[in-house]
Amino acid sequence: MPINSERLAHTFEALVQCDSVSRSEGRFAGQLQARLEALGVATLFDRSAPRTGSDTGNLVGRRAGTIDKAPLLFSAHMDTVQPGVGIRPVFEDGIFRSAGDT
């Protein structure tokens, strides 16, 4: 299946622009959850938020596979470091970069 570069770039821009500074990544987590569920992935949040001081727990997604295929695990951070609010991505010469003010 070919990659839809335009859709991928649009998705990347939308996610980068969602503020997600450490312990305040709940809005980003909600966006990610909606995107995963739209792809048929069952999601849940664990109860780690009170222990970490975050406004959200870890997002866990699971999609049933088949016996004849190897399982796949994907793990990533949802938070960014300061300054991570108001990030404006710029796409130039086939490369994304920050506008330089964050």
Could you describe each region identified by the protein language model?
Residues 35, 55, 62, 68-102:
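Active-site metal-coordination/substrate-binding segment of hydrolases
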Residues 7-13, 51, 70-73, 81:
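Short, functionally important structural connectors and interaction interfaces within domains
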Residues 1-26:
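N-terminal capping segment at the start of a domain
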Residues 20-68:
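A non-catalytic alpha/beta surface segment that caps or lines the substrate-entry region
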Residues 1-2, 46-48, 74-76:
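Intrinsically disordered, low-complexity segments enriched in polar/charged residues with Gly/Pro
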Residues 14, 30, 46-47, 93, ...:
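Intrinsically disordered, low-complexity regions enriched in small/polar residues
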